[in-house]
């Protein structure tokens, strides 16, 4: 449908910089996710693309055509909001048909298209109902149907599943992915939910404080975060971070955090010390395992801790451990025997899947 390019886009509200010199390229037919915490500027980006907000500086292009001064109605985009924004006095059929009605589309064609879209979204049986008679999931589908029936060039979706219950949200995610693949419409989806982003997007842009920190496919971002913010934001539970220092023992060099020692390359250590960088070690909860303190075989890549909280999730257990007044998280198999108050030995499974960051800048170093 359309390739969308944002070039050095900035948006200010008074002295507040909501979007700060942001550049993005969204490919034709791509399902692109803007992911970040509340207030990071992702909804403002969506509004700028739609033309609902004016640029402070920069340019926006649709298929190479600058659309900075193009009014919203001329951009041929369809938006779905968190609140769904259905007309309360109209039933579902009338809400879906409304965009065609204002275009003066023939009644017979409107009827045909509404029935087609309703069938696609499995809402044919609720077309006679008013919004107050519909569940959150049904209202979400009606809002989507109203966007689809316009046959826009671009879909802009602003947290459309946030008001849907957890069970239905899982189903709705799958339906949205399938629908986007079928319609082949460039889709830009805003969310603060990293699970939505990881499961739905072809690519993800991580945003914070009006800037993009990293753009890539879900696996790339999970496995190769560029900084501590991305590493801590993407992944559930989030990455564990350990503060420490470099130590030398005979011919060996280690990163040491309390009783945890992780071997590092001498060249890496020398570079860090030369630049006077304070190191942070990052380890994902899935890369840790636990055992009895009595099973300690080596002083390398393990440490002792106390079990603080045990969350049994059915297929696995999330353990919160306490170490030196810090809380860290570990994912272990459901059959693991563990109780609150246990003293345990925590081991790093795979040292090649650990990360080092600059404490001051947050930048990933290795």
Language-model features, listed with the residues they occupy:
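Conserved hydrophobic segment flanking the Walker A/P-loop of ABC-type ATPase nucleotide-binding domains
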Residues: 24-26
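The feature captures the beta-strand-to-loop junction immediately N-terminal to the Walker
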Residues: 35-37
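Helix-to-loop junction immediately C-terminal to a conserved catalytic motif
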Residues: 50
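Conserved coupling/switch loops of ABC nucleotide-binding domains, chiefly the family-specific signature
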Residues: 56-59, 109, 209, 243
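Conserved ABC transporter NBD signature motif
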Residues: 58-66
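ABC ATPase nucleotide-binding domains
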Residues: 72-229, 233
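Glycine/charge-rich catalytic "coupling/switch" loops of P-loop NTPases
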Residues: 252-308, 336-366
């Amino acid at each position: 449908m359309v390739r969308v390019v944002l070039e050095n886009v900035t948006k200010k509200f008074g002295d507040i910089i909501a979007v700060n010199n942001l550049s993005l390229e969204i490919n034709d037919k791509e399902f692109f996710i803007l992911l970040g915490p509340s207030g990071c500027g992702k909804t403002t980006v969506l509004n700028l693309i739609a033309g609902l907000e004016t640029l402070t500086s920069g340019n926006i292009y649709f298929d190479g055509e600058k659309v900075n001064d193009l009014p919203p109605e001329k951009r041929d985009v369809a938006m779905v909001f968190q609140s769904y924004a259905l007309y309360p006095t109209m039933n579902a059929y009338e809400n879906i048909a409304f965009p065609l009605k204002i275009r003066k589309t023939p009644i017979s064609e409107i009827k045909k298209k509404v029935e087609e879209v309703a069938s696609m979204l499995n809402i044919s049986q609720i077309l006679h109902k008013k919004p107050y008679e519909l569940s959150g999931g049904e209202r979400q589908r009606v809002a989507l149907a109203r966007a689809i029936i316009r046959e826009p060039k671009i879909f802009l979706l602003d947290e459309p599943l946030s008001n849907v219950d957890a069970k239905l949200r899982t189903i709705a995610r799958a339906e949205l992915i399938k629908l986007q693949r079928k319609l082949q419409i460039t889709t830009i989806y805003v969310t603060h939910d990293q699970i939505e982003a990881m499961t739905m997007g072809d690519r993800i842009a991580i945003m914070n404080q009006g800037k993009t920190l990293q753009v890539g496919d879900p696996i790339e971002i999970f496995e190769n975060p560029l900084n501590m913010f991305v590493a801590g934001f993407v992944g559930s539970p989030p990455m564990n971070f350990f503060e420490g220092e470099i130590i030398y023992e005979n011919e060996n060099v280690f990163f040491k955090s309390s009783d945890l020692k992780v071997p590092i390359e001498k060249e890496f250590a020398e570079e860090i010390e030369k630049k006077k960088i304070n190191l942070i070690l990052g380890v994902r909860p899935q890369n840790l395992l636990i055992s009895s303190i009595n099973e300690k075989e080596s002083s390398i890549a393990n440490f002792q801790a106390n079990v603080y909280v045990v969350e049994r999730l059915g297929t696995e257990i999330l353990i919160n451990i306490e170490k030196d007044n810090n809380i860290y998280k570990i994912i272990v198999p459901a059959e693991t025997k563990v109780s609150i108050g246990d003293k345990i030995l925590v081991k790093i499974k795979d040292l090649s899947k650990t990360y080092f960051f600059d404490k001051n800048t947050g930048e990933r170093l290795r």
